[in-house]
From Swiss-Prot:
Keywords: Cytoplasm, GTP-binding, Hydrolase, Metal-binding, Nucleotide-binding, Ribosome biogenesis, RNA-binding, rRNA-binding, Zinc. The keyword GTP-binding applies. It comes from Leptospira interrogans serogroup Icterohaemorrhagiae serovar Lai (strain 56601). GO terms for biological process: ribosomal small subunit biogenesis. The gene is rsgA. It comes from the Bacteria. PANTHER family: SMALL RIBOSOMAL SUBUNIT BIOGENESIS GTPASE RSGA (PTHR32120:SF10). CDD domains: YjeQ_EngC. Belongs to the TRAFAC class YlqF/YawG GTPase family. RsgA subfamily. The lineage of its organism: Bacteria, Pseudomonadati, Spirochaetota, Spirochaetia, Leptospirales. This is Small ribosomal subunit biogenesis GTPase RsgA.
Length: 359
């Protein structure tokens, strides 16, 4: 089989990753999922676009296909339809937990190289949301860059930049006004040819304006943002990959714009987002310390003496509690093990918030 050498490589295909895939020798062709529309998907192969439907075996397996997937397809001669025979291994995979109290998680997107976290420096500004997004990126395996937008609407952009910098650690940060095309184009320095980027951010953060600037036209419609509260809606409902004129692949996926994203992860990954807590935890008396009411807790001591800010501490406890709740929902044994610790965490968090309110 001849290897793709132009179209698919522009969409990020790396032949070396899949050379060992035996099905490539069975008359199948690689392609990438550009968009998913219910029972079929739009797939790009070296010869152009196809409409993909699942094979019977793949449908029976229960696997779901998402925008960004690399797949192996079997063409139907003389037809725009093709049969998706296999979903290739994902190098990164973005999920969120199912709504409500349902078990499991929803696949959102795959094979993302870079997550751009977009946050407005107006009423959209929230350091705590940045922490949540950094954790989501850590779990997905993708790299992340933070883009602080609307600096022209902020009275103290430098102070907010420094506040986010203390949270972000080594994560790159750009501060722009998306209405200034020159400033928006600075984002391109983070996007290599063939690499896939996508966005995280709440409605009204300026994602649509940035997307249109990067794509060189009004691909995504935008609604006005209310002056009173800074809110707005990104009106796209499609999930699709676009080639950037400068190289790279842009994914606009409405399923990953929400603030409440949360899914699989580990306590170790959470501590990577809160490194000061990980350091202080080394001083804890107990290895399974929940950093609440246990005696000789290094984290609580660090909060009391100012080495860890209360805001960061409460944010960590909140995310840790969510993580435990997700794990317990999906693992009955884990639920039994975590039940007592969860009660202690809730009680301690309420007490600390109450004590803080009295000061």
């Amino acid at each position: 089989m001849s290897q793709p050498n132009s179209i698919l490589m522009s969409y990020g295909w790396d032949p070396s990753i899949y050379l060992e895939e035996p099905k490539l020798l069975e008359g199948l062709k690689p392609g990438r999922v550009l968009a998913v529309y219910g029972e079929y998907s739009k797939i790009i192969i070296e010869q152009g676009e196809k409409k993909g439907i699942f094979s019977g075996a793949l449908m029976a397996s229960g696997e779901s296909i998402v925008t960004g997937d690399w797949v192996l397809i079997r063409e139907i001669e003389g037809d725009e339809l093709c049969i998706v025979e296999k979903i290739l291994p994902r190098k990164t995979f973005l999920r969120r937990s199912n709504p409500g109290k349902r078990k499991g998680s929803q696949a959102i997107a795959s094979n993302i190289d870079l997550l751009l976290v977009i946050m407005g420096l107006d009423n959209d500004y929230s350091p705590r949301r940045i922490e949540r997004y950094l954790f989501l990126a850590k779990v997905s395996g993708a790299q992340v860059t933070i883009v602080l937008n609307k600096k022209d609407l902020c009275m103290d952009p430098e102070n907010k930049f420094m506040e986010i910098k203390t949270i972000a650690g080594e994560t790159p940060i750009e501060m722009i006004s998306a209405l200034d095309l020159k400033q928006t184009r600075t984002i391109l320095q983070w996007i290599d040819p063939g690499k896939t980027i996508t966005f995280l951010g709440s409605s009204g953060a300026g994602k649509s304006t940035i997307i249109n600037s990067l794509l060189g036209g009004e691909i995504q419609k935008t609604n006005e943002v209310k002056v009173s509260d800074g809110t707005g809606k990104h009106t796209t409902t499609r999930r699709e990959l676009f080639l950037l004129p400068s190289g790279g692949v842009l994914m606009d996926n409405p399923g990953i714009r929400e603030v409440g994203l949360f899914s699989e992860g580990s306590e170790d990954e959470l501590e990577e987002v809160f490194p000061e807590i990980a350091v202080a935890a080394e001083e804890c008396r107990f290895n399974d310390c929940s950093h609440n009411e246990e005696p000789n807790c290094g984290v609580v001591a660090a909060v009391k003496d100012g080495r860890i800010s209360e805001a960061r501490y409460f944010s960590y406890l909140k995310l840790s509690k969510e993580l435990m709740a997700y794990q317990a929902l999906n693992d009955p044994e884990e639920a039994r093990k975590k039940k007592q610790k969860d009660k202690q965490m809730s009680k301690a968090l309420q007490k600390r918030l109450k004590d803080k309110g009295r000061k």
